[in-house]
Regions:
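Generic recognition of short, well-ordered alpha-helical segments
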Residues: 36, 40, 131, 165-166, ...
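Conserved small/polar residues in nucleotide/adenosyl-binding loops
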Residues: 240-245
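Beta-strand secondary-structure signal
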Residues: 75-77, 152, 204-208
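Metal-dependent peptidase/peptidase-like ectodomains
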Residues: 184, 193-228
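Acidic/His- and Gly-rich active-site-bordering loop/insert found
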Residues: 2-118, 142-148
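Acidic/histidine-rich catalytic neighborhood of metal-dependent amide-processing enzymes
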Residues: 126-200
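A short, acidic/glycine-rich surface segment
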Residues: 64-65, 98-100, 192-196, 216
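Alpha-helical metal-binding/catalytic segments enriched in His/Glu/Asp
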Residues: 91, 118-160, 209, 220-237
Length: 245
C-alpha cells in the first residue's frame, strides 16, 4: 500500500471523530460580536492538541480592538515538530462565528447531523475546517510519526470583525514569519474540491502627490496634483492587467 493510500485509509477511519469534533466545537458559542467564550474554546483545543503531542501556547491579544476583561481576545497556537523544524505547514482557522440570525430549523449549537451534513452556527465557517485540520494532522502523524518538518495549528480570534485581535496581532509578533512558517493552509469554506492561492498578503502605503495652485481661469499656471495621482493609479492598474502566475 502506498503512502497516499495509507493516509486516505487513516483519514477514512477517523470520519466519526471528525464529525464529533465538529459538533463539540459548534457547541461552544463563540459569537462575535461580542466575542463570547474565546477562552473556553481555546482551552478545549489546548486539551485536544496537547493530547496529540503538540506543544501549545495560548495568547491573549492585550490592547487589541475589542479586547477587555469581559471579552478577552484569546488565541491558541499548537506546534509539533518531526525530525526537523522545517518546512513548517501552518493550518489557520478562526474560532469566532457570526450571530445566529433567524430561520433555523435546528438548534444552532447542537451540531445536528442530517442527510450526511452537520448543521450548526459555524459548521461551515469555519469550525468544520478547524476540525478537519486537526483530524488530518493527527492522521498524518499516525502514519508518518517521523516526518520531516513541523505542523502548526492555530485558532484565532475576531476574523469576523477584522482579525485585529487574532491573525493581525499574531502576525505583528512574528508568529507567521518566514523564519517560523513556510506554508499556510486556511480551510475556509469554498468548495470541497477547490484549492486555491487565496491570500498573498497586503502592503499598506500612503502616497501623496503635490501640485501648485492656480486660478481656474488660468490652469496652465498651476500643476494639478489630482492629475499626478491619476498617473500613479494608472501605473498601479497595470500591475493587475493579467492574473499572477
Amino acid at each position: 500500500m502506498s503512502l497516499t493510500e495509507r493516509l486516505i485509509e487513516e483519514v477514512a477511519a477517523r470520519r466519526d471523530d471528525l464529525v464529533g469534533l465538529t459538533q463539540e466545537l459548534i457547541a461552544i458559542p463563540t459569537l462575535n460580536p461580542p466575542g463570547d467564550n474565546y477562552l473556553e474554546i481555546c482551552e478545549y483545543l489546548e486539551r485536544r492538541l496537547s493530547g496529540a503531542g503538540f506543544e501549545t501556547q495560548m495568547i491573549r491579544a492585550h490592547g487589541a480592538p475589542g479586547d477587555s476583561d469581559t471579552y478577552p481576545r484569546w488565541n491558541i497556537i499548537a506546534r509539533r515538530e518531526g525530525a526537523c523544524a522545517h518546512p513548517c505547514v501552518h493550518f489557520n482557522s478562526h474560532i469566532d462565528v457570526v450571530e445566529v440570525g433567524h430561520g433555523w430549523s435546528v438548534d444552532p449549537f447542537a451540531g445536528v447531523v442530517k442527510d450526511g451534513r452537520v448543521y450548526g452556527r459555524g459548521a461551515c465557517d469555519m469550525k468544520g475546517g478547524m476540525a478537519a485540520s486537526i483530524v488530518a494532522a493527527e492522521a498524518f502523524i499516525a502514519v508518518c510519526p517521523d516526518f520531516n518538518g513541523a505542523i502548526e495549528i492555530s485558532g484565532t480570534a475576531d476574523e469576523e470583525s477584522g482579525g485585529f485581535g487574532g491573525v493581525a496581532y499574531l502576525a505583528e509578533r512574528g508568529f507567521f514569519s518566514p523564519e517560523r512558517v513556510d506554508h499556510v493552509i486556511i480551510p475556509e469554506p469554498l468548495n470541497k474540491d477547490r484549492i486555491c492561492l487565496g491570500h498573498r498578503g497586503v502592503w499598506w502605503a500612503e502616497i501623496e502627490t503635490k501640485g501648485e495652485i492656480a486660478h481656474g481661469s488660468m490652469p496652465f499656471l498651476g500643476d494639478c496634483a489630482v492629475r499626478h495621482m491619476g498617473a500613479v493609479m494608472a501605473e498601479i492598474c497595470l500591475l493587475y492587467t493579467s492574473p499572477s502566475p
